[in-house]
């Protein structure tokens, strides 16, 4: 599956680059995280999406319910359901793999499946690999997914997901 970022996503890309540059400037080093076992449960209330194509009338508010089971310092399983950008309900299941860090920000991707997008496989399930950044502090965290545009079927966005640790 080939993704492309459109010219209109330049503002979003500039914002991402500024975030990464700021993190790199503040951090002592770029680190490879050592994988050690964990048992943490996080819950989230969905997403807020800042779409690159602002003229499409897409839904930026994506409420829902999701969970993340962090079984390692570098990996976690995730599942959830939310009201998507196309104003339809979507479900997802996947695995975050984030083996790198710049300061307190973990870097990697979430790989899994999504459904509910009418223009993508008629709303059926499809695979996706999405770059992600994560920051966690005690019982609160934030996942930032950098969702690329895919043809005229999926619209690119910066997807912000607030999460809360409920068990460790």
Indicate residue ranges for each PLM-predicted region.
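Residues on the lipid-exposed face of transmembrane beta-strands in outer-membrane beta-barrel proteins
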Residues: 45, 65-69, 79, 93-98, ...
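Solvent-exposed loop/turn segments connecting transmembrane beta-strands
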Residues: 52-61, 81-92, 101, 115-126, ...
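Outer-membrane beta-barrel "beta-signal"
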Residues: 47-50, 155-168
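Short glycine/proline- and aromatic-enriched beta-strand/turn motifs that initiate or cap beta-hairpins
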Residues: 26-73, 78-81
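Cleavable N-terminal export/targeting peptides
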Residues: 1-37
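Outer membrane beta-barrel
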Residues: 106-116, 123-126, 130-147
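Hydrophobic, lipid-facing positions within transmembrane beta-strands of outer-membrane proteins
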Residues: 41, 61-65, 75, 89-93, ...
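Repeated loop/turn-to-beta-strand initiation elements of outer-membrane beta-barrel proteins
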Residues: 41, 73-77, 103-105, 133-144, ...
């Amino acid at each position: 599956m080939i993704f492309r970022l459109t010219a209109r996503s330049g503002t979003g890309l500039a914002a991402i680059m500024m975030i990464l540059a700021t993190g790199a400037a503040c951090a002592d080093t770029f680190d490879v995280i050592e994988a050690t076992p964990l048992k943490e449960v996080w819950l989230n209330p969905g997403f807020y999406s800042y779409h690159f194509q602002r003229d499409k009338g897409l839904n930026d508010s994506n409420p829902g319910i999701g969970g993340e089971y962090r079984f390692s310092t570098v990996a976690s399983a995730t599942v959830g359901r939310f009201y998507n950008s196309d104003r339809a309900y979507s479900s997802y299941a996947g695995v975050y793999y984030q083996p790198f860090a710049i300061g307190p920000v973990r870097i990697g991707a979430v790989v899994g499946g999504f459904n509910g997008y009418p223009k993508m496989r008629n709303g059926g399930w499809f695979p996706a690999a999405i770059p992600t950044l994560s920051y966690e502090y005690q019982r609160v965290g934030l996942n930032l997914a950098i969702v690329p545009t895919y043809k005229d079927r999926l619209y690119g966005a910066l997807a912000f997901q607030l999460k809360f640790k409920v068990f460790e």
